[in-house]
Amino acid sequence: MTKLLELKNISHSNKESIRVKGINLTINQGEKIALIGKSGSGKSTLISIANGSLIPNEGDVIWKGSHINNISNIESSKIGTIWQDLSLIEELNVAQNINCGALGKHNFIWALKNLLGVLDKGLCQECLAAVSLPKETIYSYINKLSGGQKKRIAIARLLRQEPEIVLGDEPFSNLDPVLSKNILNLLINQKNYLRIKIPETILISLHQINLINNFNRVIGLKDGEIVIDGEIKNINQSELDWLF
């Protein structure tokens, strides 16, 4: 299997507490990984370190053989992340926000055209359809949308980015169970009816334990350490009960 992302001997702490410790993790191309653990177990910290936005006190993050601090902007754009804090731009409309997902692959002129609203909106509409929003939504402004709609826009922006891997920090919070499962099915089952390429590899933290059966690998964190790592078929209910 092709290694995409490696976390080697990762430990990180702040003044209040140890966040993660002794993390060794390899994510291979095509893996669908659920990251689980109770609140405060270190899931958000691990995601932040994995995408390079948080530098750990100890250890290294390797992306396709290169240290994550040394990769180009184009390579960085191949690592897609969706946060609980969605980071949408309130002053822009939905189409402009979705196209922001592709900024890493284009030049300044393309970015300017996006701000002017003159780019083709077809791909944006396809991304909206993937998250069950009507195509007319592209003309709406972010500050007019509900929390659940904003979450779907953030996921649509991630799809527009066309990353090789998706890192998600509880991306399905604020979404109803049916929609959560539909979007997860899009990522897991690779239904490429879109012109955009659906990412093959995902690492997503979850609080909806009922969704983990959709993944082929489960990682459990407890007090900042990996205590479960294996195929879902090999993890029993008593292990999950102990984890939480």
Named regions from a protein language model:
Residues H67-W83, G117:
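ABC ATPase NBD coupling module
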Residues V166-D169:
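Catalytic Walker B motif of ABC-type/P-loop ATPase nucleotide-binding domains
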Residues Y141-L145, Q149:
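Conserved ABC ATPase signature
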Residues A154-I155:
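Hydrophobic anchor residue at the start of the ABC signature
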